[in-house]
Amino acid sequence: MGNEVADASVWQARAAAWELAALSLRYPDAELAEAAAGGEWDEAAGEILAALGLPAEVPAAAGEGGCDTAGPAGADALLRALRPEATRLFVGAPEPACSPYEGVWAAEADGVQPLLFVNPRSMEVERFMRSCGLGRPEGTNEPLDHVATECELLERLALRAAGAPASEGAPDGAGLPGGSPAAAYETFLSGHAQAWMPAFAERLAAEARHPFYRAAAAYLGALVG
C-alpha cells in the first residue's frame, strides 16, 4: 500500500509538472500572467522540480526585479508584454524565432523542408494522441505536435497513472499504447518529448527577450534533460 501511495504521489507531481509547462508554452492568457506576476509561477516551478528530485535553477518569471506594479495592474502589464513576445517566438513573420512544433524540429534535423500537419513526425504524434483520446479541439486548426499540446498529453497520462479516471472518449488503461497509462507516458516521453524539447528549450532560452520565456525554457529543460 505504501509503495502504491508513493507511486501515485510521483505521478501526481509529474502531472503538475506538465500542467505548468503546458500553461507556460501556450498563447499567454490572464491565468498565466497572474501566476507569473504574483510569484506563484516561480513557487510552483521550484516545488515541482524539488518534488521530482530535479535540482535546477529557474530564473524569476517576471525578471529579477519582479513586476513594477503589484496585483491586477501588474498582471495586465505582463500579459501585454508576453503576447507580442509569444507571437515573435512561436508564430513569427515570416518565420518564428523558435518553432513550437515537433515536426518542424524533426524536419530540420533531417535537412528537409518542414510542412505543418503533413510531415511524418506530426502525423505520428497525431495518431498517438488520438489513440490516447486527445484530438484537436473542435473549431481549431492547431497541429497536435505543438509543445504545449504534447505537455498536456503527458499531464493527462500522468494523471491516469496516478489513478484518475479516463476522460470522456479516452480508452481504458489497457487500451492505451503499451497497455497502461505509465507505458504510454514513458513511450511518448522518450520517443517524442525528449527527442526534441531539450533543443527547443535551449533555443528558446537563447532567443527569448522576456525573462518569463527564459524561465520557461529553464523549467522545460529540467523536465526533459
Which residues does each predicted region cover?
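Surface/interface-facing alpha-helical segments and adjacent flexible terminal/loop regions used
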Residues: 1-225
